[in-house]
């Protein structure tokens, strides 16, 4: 029999990196076309007027203006300034 046992590896260290999701531009803020408004998984919020949706459901401004969140309809739009 061995007089020393084998080393066991740590059971920690498998956590994935955070994906930095969430609101990047808040309601009332001015934005330029192309500015990211929200990074999300799935359509938690939908694109309204002057807002585009990326391949990963990112919402971004299509025109310059002010961000407006429509809470009851879960929609984001850009009001042209």
UniProtKB/Swiss-Prot annotation:
Residues 1-22 are annotated as: Disordered. Coiled coil: none annotated. GO terms for cellular component: cytosolic large ribosomal subunit. One of its GO terms (molecular function) is structural constituent of ribosome. InterPro entries: Ribosomal_bL27, Ribosomal_bL27_CS. PANTHER family: LARGE RIBOSOMAL SUBUNIT PROTEIN BL27M, RIBOSOMAL PROTEIN L27. This is Large ribosomal subunit protein bL27. It comes from Opitutus terrae (strain DSM 11246 / JCM 15787 / PB90-1). The lineage of its organism: Bacteria, Pseudomonadati, Verrucomicrobiota, Opitutia, Opitutales. The gene is rpmA.
């Amino acid at each position: 029999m061995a007089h020393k046992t084998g080393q066991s590896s740590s059971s920690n260290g498998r956590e994935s990196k955070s994906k930095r999701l969430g609101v990047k531009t808040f309601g009332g803020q001015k934005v330029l076309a192309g500015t990211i408004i929200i990074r999300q998984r799935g359509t938690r919020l939908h694109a309204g007027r002057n807002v585009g949706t990326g391949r990963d459901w990112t919402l971004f401004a299509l025109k310059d203006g002010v961000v407006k969140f429509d809470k009851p309809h879960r929609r984001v739009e850009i009001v042209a300034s």
